[in-house]
From Swiss-Prot:
Site residues by UniProt (Important for hydrogen atom transfer): 218, 444
The protein's assembly and partners: Heterotetramer of two large/R1 and two small/R2 subunits. A radical transfer pathway may occur between 'Tyr-125' of protein R2 and R1.
Result of altering residue 264 to D: In dpd2; loss of pollen plastid DNA degradation
Gene Ontology molecular function: any one: ATP binding
Ways its activity is controlled: Under complex allosteric control mediated by deoxynucleoside triphosphates and ATP binding to separate specificity and activation sites on the large subunit. The type of nucleotide bound at the specificity site determines substrate preference. It seems probable that ATP makes the enzyme reduce CDP and UDP, dGTP favors ADP reduction and dTTP favors GDP reduction. Stimulated by ATP and inhibited by dATP binding to the activity site.
Tissue: Highly expressed in actively growing tissues such as young leaves, shoot apices, inflorescences and carpels. Very low expression in cotyledons, adult and cauline leaves and senescent leaves.
SUPFAM superfamilies reported in the protein's UniProt record: PFL-like glycyl radical enzymes, R1 subunit of ribonucleotide reductase, N-terminal domain
Matches recorded under PROSITE patterns: ATP_CONE, RIBORED_LARGE
Residues that coordinate or bind GDP: 202, 217, 427, 431, 623-626
EC supergroup of this enzyme: oxidoreductase
Protein name: Ribonucleoside-diphosphate reductase large subunit
Induction per the UniProt record: Basal expression regulated by ATR/RAD3. Can be induced by another pathway when dNTPs levels are low.
């Protein structure tokens, strides 16, 4: 049996060589729990004649990763093998790697196809010695296996299909792409990112330093005009943006409804559904940046639009295909008046925007005046019971998890862009609230701060601090470093502001908007991990206080950095007349007095003198991919489970929450039997008798935390979020009562985004093939009442809904 080495030579397979390589990579890992010889044995069992050493490394990494549920150190070993393999296949020198990418020639066409921009290449060549010497390749070994594989699959640049970048090369490329010839800032950004304090968003990591550096994540498009020309111009804009890896939110409030008269052709309109099917096919066809991600459009509609019922059906799994557009995402832009009519069981009038114009262009009292005027004039196409439309909204949410719920009046009332005009939609992920018009496509550049990194061990200086902490057992010896958070927030603000200037804009309307208003979006990841490291249950008073303190710090120091930029560069173009220009900050709009942790009086004084460089600053986004890269839980969400399965080339295996695994291993409680119990309980430890109660509280999953608390925490940080937040709602078995009371709770709390996705769990358990049932003791029988899951008929659902509206407190107490 032979292997093929990287230089093409053949060599007999030596078990000892494989073992020696794995032992070398096991430095610092627990020899009691992590056995490289066992991994080597499993690898040898999978060897075949002619296997390459690179493939052997891949198999070894997957084998070690599959053993992670035995001990956390196997995850570290898996990552080290994978990273070491990449290092063997790539050049060490950053500048040499950049040279290879710059002089890249397409092997099919024979044409020069540089992967690096000319100016970035020149800067790197001029500063090659300094940049090369700053890179610390050992930091690549700090990624966990799945984080590294995510980078390798989608983020590291490839030549002829082969990855040529190392993670550290990518981070330096991104830093140079943002800061260009400001080498001191390049190096500062590189070190902060490579030490995992924060990360820029996926499009920035994909494209920084390349010939077309499209670094923005979010685009908000307004339908240009209610005409064939306007619709197709908007469609083209969406396609061009999607090509460049941007997610899109598009508002369609102004498109005339079904049956509306078309003067130009003396015909009648087909409404929004056939149009949205065309947008649906465009989203499918144009993926984000050459197959990286499928195009994604969220469509926003106000509930007074006469096609709203058809709109709510578009994502459902049943029904006629010509009435469905399942690849789009749907969102409602809800005025307060609609919520009041539902609450009071009033009537609701549906209009065609062609016959009742202007409703999308106003909010608050002005909207109510115009809406009731049209009602009195008899312009409604249809009048329905508001609760009946609400019922259809809930039906769609229970079936599909959408539409998203955003409150139009809160979004406008609490926006620093309200001086520009009425804001008509959010973005794909519901955290960006920006003004759009036919001539302005709103854009946002994002970055997220990795909160677990700021949990520090007392008395340990920063330069000798471990890069990653795990588990809650040492929480008494830890604290949260707000000073470092302040410093990193300032750097992130400066970076995102620079991106506005160096960015490649796929459409001119996007450049116009971004240059005028200069909004940015700073988010977080790993809030749940930070709570665990500090030994705080997610819903504890301590966690709720830390949640406020973190976001107060981020908002304060983002504003401070922005006003310092304005002192040098001037305020953004449309600053005059904005709430901030009048001294009104986000906490003022929520009637909240900030703590005295930071000196707000001094900040207000600075702003009154200098203005601010950016109209908007804070927007906690979902961080789906980047949190996986850094090994953190998503954004500000609780853990959804303590155990989940991963599929890789060699099969499927179980992964356990690294903090829980760390704690249980240190306590000597982790056994194959306990693992089986955890799988059988769907990742919950609440019913596992061996685990102490204090750990059960810390590791409660989102299904065991009251959603009311999740909403309270969203509102607590809301007064420091000048955009919005991607707030998912998790409900085990959603019914109309729980959903209604929850939506009304988010509305009354003043949230801008009431709900991103509704996440629910199936009532029936899937068969767990990975559970060794012999290890499980007999479970107590389920209560008879739970066995008979009856179909609730429509009358029952309506009764529940009405009950929750009339008795909101009682209904919320029942556990939504």
């Amino acid at each position: 049996m032979y292997v093929v080495k990287r230089d093409g030579r053949q060599e007999t397979v030596h078990f000892d060589k494989i073992t020696a390589r794995l032992k070398k990579l096991s430095y610092g890992l627990s020899s009691d729990h992590c056995d490289p010889v066992l991994v080597a044995q499993k690898v040898c069992a999978g060897v075949y004649k002619g296997v390459t050493t690179s493939q052997l490394d891949e198999l070894a990494a997957e084998t070690a990763a599959a053993m992670t549920c035995n001990h956390p150190d196997y995850a570290s070993l898996a990552a080290r093998i994978a990273v070491s393999n990449l290092h063997k296949n790539t050049k060490k020198s950053f500048s040499e790697t950049i040279k290879d990418m710059f002089y890249h020639v397409n092997d099919r066409s024979g044409l020069k196809s540089p992967l690096i921009a000319d100016d970035v290449f020149e800067i790197i060549m001029q500063n090659a010695a300094r940049l090369d010497s700053e890179i610390i390749y050992d930091r690549d070994f700090e990624y966990d296996y799945f984080g590294f594989k995510t980078l390798e699959r989608s983020y590291l640049l490839k030549v002829q299909g082969t990855v040529v970048e190392r993670p550290q090369h990518m981070l330096m490329r991104v830093a140079v792409g943002i800061h260009k010839d400001d080498i001191d800032s390049v190096i500062q950004t590189y070190h902060l990112m490579s030490q995992r304090w924060f990360t820029h968003a996926s499009p920035t990591l994909f494209n920084a330093g390349t010939p077309r550096p499209q670094l923005s994540s979010c685009f908000l498009v307004c339908m240009k005009d209610d005409s064939i020309e306007g619709i197709y111009e908007t469609l083209k804009e969406c396609a061009v943006i999607s090509k460049s890896a941007g997610g899109i939110g598009v508002s369609v409030h102004n498109i005339r409804a079904t049956g509306s008269y078309i003067r130009g052709t003396n015909g009648t309109s087909n409404g929004i559904v056939p149009m949205l099917r065309v947008f649906n096919d465009t989203a499918r066809y144009v993926d984000q940046g050459g197959g990286k991600r499928k195009g994604a459009f969220a469509v926003y509609l106000e509930p007074w639009h006469a096609d709203v019922y058809e709109f709510l059906e578009l994502r459902k799994n049943h029904g006629k295909e010509e009435h469905r557009a399942r690849d789009l995402f749907y969102a409602l832009w809800l005025p307060d008046l609609f919520m009041e009519r539902v609450q009071n069981n009033g009537q609701w009038s549906l209009f065609c925007p062609n016959e009742a114009p202007g409703l999308a262009d106003c909010w608050g009292a002005e909207f109510e005046t115009l809406y009731t005027k049209y009602e009195r004039e008899g312009k409604a196409k249809k009048v329905v019971q508001a609760q009946q439309l609400w019922y259809e909204i809930l039906t769609s949410q229970v079936e599909t998890g959408t539409p998203y719920m955003l409150f139009k009046d809160s979004c406008n009332r609490k926006s620093n862009q309200q001086n520009l005009g009425t804001i008509k939609s959010s973005n794909l992920c519901t955290e960006i609230i920006e003004y759009t018009s036919p001539t302005e496509t709103a854009v946002c550049n994002l970055a997220s701060i990795a909160l677990p990194r700021f949990v520090r061990e007392k008395g340990v200086p920063l330069d000798s601090h471990p890069p990653k902490l795990a588990g809650s057992l040492d929480s008494k010896n830890r604290y949260f470093d707000f000073e470092k958070l302040a410093e990193v927030t300032a750097t992130v603000t400066v970076n995102l502001n620079k991106i506005i200037d160096v960015n490649y804009y796929p459409v001119e309307t996007a450049k116009t908007s971004n240059m005028r208003h200069r909004p940015i979006g700073i988010g977080v990841q790993g809030l749940a991990d930070a709570f665990i490291l500090l030994g705080m249950p997610f819903d504890s008073p301590e966690a709720q206080q830390l949640n406020k303190d973190i976001f107060e710090t981020i908002y304060y120091h983002a504003l401070k950095a922005s006003t310092e930029l304005a002192a040098r560069l001037g305020p953004y173009e449309t600053y005059a007349g904005s709430p901030v220009s009048k001294g009104i900050l986000q906490p003022d709009m929520w009637n909240v007095i900030p703590s005295d942790r930071w000196d707000w009086a001094v900040l207000r004084d600075m702003i009154s003198k200098n203005g601010v460089r950016n109209s908007l600053l804070v927007a906690p986004m979902p961080t789906a991919s980047t949190s996986q890269i850094l090994g953190n839980n998503e954004c500000f969400e609780p853990y959804t489970s303590n155990i989940y399965s991963r599929r890789v080339l060699s099969g499927e295996f179980v992964v356990v929450n690294k903090h829980l695994l760390h704690d249980l291993t240190d306590m000597g409680l982790w056994t194959p039997t306990l693992k089986n119990k955890l799988i059988n309980e769907n990742g919950s430890i609440v019913n596992v008798a061996e685990i102490p109660d204090d750990l059960k509280a810390i590791y409660r999953t989102v299904w065991e935390i009251k959603q009311r608390t999740v909403v309270d925490m969203a509102a607590d940080r809301g007064c420091y979020i000048d955009q919005s937040q991607s707030l998912n709602i998790h409900m085990d078995k959603p019914n109309f009562a729980k959903l209604t009371s929850l939506h009304f709770y988010t509305w009354k709390k003043g949230l801008k985004t009431g709900m991103y996705y509704l996440r629910s769990r199936a009532a029936a358990d899937a068969i767990k093939f990975t559970v060794d049932t012999a290890m499980l003791k007999e479970k107590p029988s389920v209560a008879e009442g739970d066995k008979e899951v009856e179909e609730e008929d429509n009358e029952t659902k309506l009764a529940q809904m009405v009950c929750s509206l009339t008795n909101p407190e009682e209904c919320l107490a029942c556990g939504s």
